[in-house]
Amino acid sequence: MKVTVVSRSGREVLKAPLDLPDSATVADLQEAFHKRAKKFYPSRQRLTLPVTPGSKDKPVVLNSKKSLKEYCDGNNNSLTVVFKDLGAQVSYRTLFFFEYLGPLLIYPVFYYFPVYKFLGYGEDCVIHPVQTYAMYYWCFHYFKRILETFFVHRFSHATSPIGNVFRNCAYYWSFGAYIAYYVNHPLYTPVSDLQMKIGFGFGLVCQVANFYCHILLKNLRDPSGAGGYQIPRGFLFNIVTCANYTTEIYQWLGFNIATQTIAGYVFLAVAALIMTNWALGKHSRLRKIFDGKDGKPKYPRRWVILPPFL
């Protein structure tokens, strides 16, 4: 089988077509392409079928696990594919590890080290119990996130553009420093013991619930990474489409009830907006896929992310 690789403008990317056996898969094509163009390793390649000029149809993305024959017309023994360079890639585990490592290391710096001394405050600073519990709560959360990244999460995509590492790290690391600065500040005014206990108690329950939601989501995904959508079921997923986001938002609400800083609530608002946008997209996608037609189950009526509001 001869495979011609062209750019989106129609220009041939390789000087000559690739010669592959008839039994070759898309993954074999990607490896052969990589051997001819060393720069473009498989996770950097996006291969699609050509689209007729003027057509509004979306290009069909080639599945790496499928045979190339499945994309050929009839008995045709040649194929043209369109190549797009996705840019330098990094694994999702690497991305998540670094974005979570920052807050895990930055927050204790403001608690344990004399940061405020260099900002003009005296050496004798009273550390309130809520500040100690907040540090433990914060570190537990991000340590849990890192463990989930390596031992729980299954990713539908193997890699992410390397630029996302800098963007995500800027988001998590800057908010980590912003919140840590105010919660551990020498002039920080603690809330009442009752409010602190309610906040941290509620937050810890949500952290445990969040972990269980991730276990349920893991069990929905094929270990081989084959992808595909399923209706999430069990526990909070019986009433909320994105229960993992729900518990994530509410666990930060618990943290902010206990610590009560503007910085913390700004982070909560931004995170809630981002996750709500993701949840609306996922809810809409699941309802579209599971429409009750052609033998498919109908997606049940559920809250999207924030019962009883949305």
UniProtKB/Swiss-Prot annotation:
Membrane topology: Multi-pass membrane protein
UniProt keyword Transmembrane, yes or no: yes
GO cellular component assignments: cytosol; endoplasmic reticulum; endoplasmic reticulum membrane; fatty acid elongase complex
Pfam families the UniProt entry points to: Steroid_dh
Gene Ontology terms: biological process: cuticle development; fatty acid biosynthetic process; sphingolipid metabolic process; trichome branching; trichome papilla formation; wax biosynthetic process
Tissue: Expressed in roots, leaves, stems, flowers and siliques. Detected in mature seeds.
Compartments where found: Endoplasmic reticulum membrane
Assigned EC number: 1.3.1.93
Pathway where this protein functions: Lipid metabolism; fatty acid biosynthesis
Bilayer-crossing regions: 95-115, 126-143, 164-183, 197-217, 235-255, 261-281
GO molecular function: fatty acid elongase activity; very-long-chain enoyl-CoA reductase activity
Alphabetical UniProt keywords: Endoplasmic reticulum, Fatty acid biosynthesis, Fatty acid metabolism, Lipid biosynthesis, Lipid metabolism, Membrane, NADP, Oxidoreductase, Transmembrane, Transmembrane helix
Effect of deleting the gene: Abnormal organ morphology and stem glossiness. Impaired endocytic membrane traffic and defective cell expansion.
PROSITE patterns: S5A_REDUCTASE
Catalytic activity annotation: a very-long-chain 2,3-saturated fatty acyl-CoA + NADP(+) = a very-long-chain (2E)-enoyl-CoA + NADPH + H(+)
Broad class of the protein's primary localization: endoplasmic reticulum
Family of this protein: Belongs to the steroid 5-alpha reductase family.
Biological role stated in the UniProt entry: Catalyzes the last of the four reactions of the long-chain fatty acids elongation cycle. This endoplasmic reticulum-bound enzymatic process, allows the addition of 2 carbons to the chain of long- and very long-chain fatty acids (VLCFAs) per cycle. This enzyme reduces the trans-2,3-enoyl-CoA fatty acid intermediate to an acyl-CoA that can be further elongated by entering a new cycle of elongation. Thereby, it participates in the production of VLCFAs of different chain lengths that are involved in multiple biological processes as precursors of membrane lipids and lipid mediators.
Oligomeric and partner information: Part of the fatty acid elongase complex which contains a beta-ketoacyl-CoA synthase (KCS), a beta-ketoacyl-CoA reductase (KCR), a beta-hydroxyacyl-CoA dehydratase (HCD) and an enoyl-CoA reductase (ECR).
Protein name per its UniProtKB record: Very-long-chain enoyl-CoA reductase
Organism: Arabidopsis thaliana
The organism's taxonomic lineage, starting at the top: Eukaryota, Viridiplantae, Streptophyta, Embryophyta, Tracheophyta
